[in-house]
Curated annotation (Swiss-Prot):
Name this protein carries in UniProt: Aspartyl/glutamyl-tRNA(Asn/Gln) amidotransferase subunit C
Gene3D superfamilies to which the protein is assigned, alphabetical: Glu-tRNAGln amidotransferase C subunit, N-terminal domain
Domain of life: Bacteria
Family in the record: Belongs to the GatC family.
Origin organism lineage: Bacteria, Pseudomonadati, Pseudomonadota, Betaproteobacteria, Neisseriales
Example of a GO biological process term: translation
Organism: Laribacter hongkongensis (strain HLHK9)
Family annotation (InterPro entries): Asp/Glu-ADT_sf_sub_c, GatC
Keywords, alphabetical: ATP-binding, Ligase, Nucleotide-binding, Protein biosynthesis
Segments crossing the lipid bilayer: none
């Protein structure tokens, strides 16, 4: 599946990205490369391959559930721009 220049413009608009005329060819090549990789992965015969959650079948070492660090809240909040009642105050980003 090869994308056309018009497809790149449509994808950029849907993703709310500004792609200039000069960048369009490079973006088209990169997207076509991604789709080629996906097609190559789809072509691999995986019949009989057992799904796995992790490539190494090893159990992770667990440490004891014990406190290993001291309380540094006051030191961290001393350098914070704004703190109130032990909480960090941050600017509102969503109206």
């Amino acid at each position: 599946m090869a994308l056309s220049s018009d497809d790149v413009v449509k994808i950029a608009r849907l993703a709310r990205l500004r792609v200039s005329e000069a960048e369009r060819g490079a973006v088209q090549g990169q997207l076509n490369g991604i789709f080629d990789l996906i097609e190559a992965m789809r072509a691999v015969d995986t019949a009989g391959v057992e799904p796995m959650a992790h490539p190494q079948d090893a159990a992770l070492r667990l440490r004891a559930d014990a406190v290993t660090e001291t309380d540094r809240r006051s030191a961290y909040q001393a350098v914070a721009p704004q703190v109130e009642n032990g909480l960090y105050l941050v600017p509102k980003v969503i109206e």
